[in-house]
Amino acid sequence: MRKGKPARKLGRTAAHRRATLNNLSTQLILHKRIETTEAKAKETRKVIEKMITKARKGTVHAQRDIFKDIRDKKAIRILFEEVVAKVGARNGGYTRVIKLAPRLGDAAKMAIIEFVDYSEAISPAASQKSSKQDRAKRVQGSKKNVDAVAESAE
């Protein structure tokens, strides 16, 4: 009975798929959190978890092995110094995938992938407060525009 392969193809050739996942992994290391499609996030999670497990060894061989995939020296340094120090105590599950609303243009399922132990996540209260402030500014700005249009019409 045919079972199929355990990985998503993402509509790409094997080389393009590997390059995409390596690029997403690099950006995740640099930014600690990225927004992408749900399928790409789940595949990136597989790749980055294996990289962190290798990086926890801290050997030169591990660095060279990871450098085959991530060709950014800054990202390698951050992975070995910051990320491993932060999530090194865990035995796996270094990342989380948070599902978001569908993308407006094509209704693709979107998700955020981020490292678990980083407290840089935006708290809901802070984002809600800033959105209220932005809304107040927009309302004031629109009132000024309405007044200006009314004056010019007279």
UniProtKB/Swiss-Prot annotation:
Keyword Ribonucleoprotein (UniProt): yes
Protein name in UniProt: Large ribosomal subunit protein bL17
Organism of origin: Chlorobium chlorochromatii (strain CaD3)
Record GO terms (molecular function): structural constituent of ribosome
Alphabetized UniProt keyword annotations: Ribonucleoprotein, Ribosomal protein
Primary gene name: rplQ
UniProt-annotated stretches for the region Disordered: 125-154
Domain of life from the UniProt record: Bacteria
Family under the similarity heading: Belongs to the bacterial ribosomal protein bL17 family.
SUPFAM superfamilies with a match to the protein in the record: Prokaryotic ribosomal protein L17
Any single GO BP term: translation
Subunit structure: Part of the 50S ribosomal subunit. Contacts protein L32.
Pfam family of the protein (one): Ribosomal_L17
GO CC annotation: cytosolic large ribosomal subunit
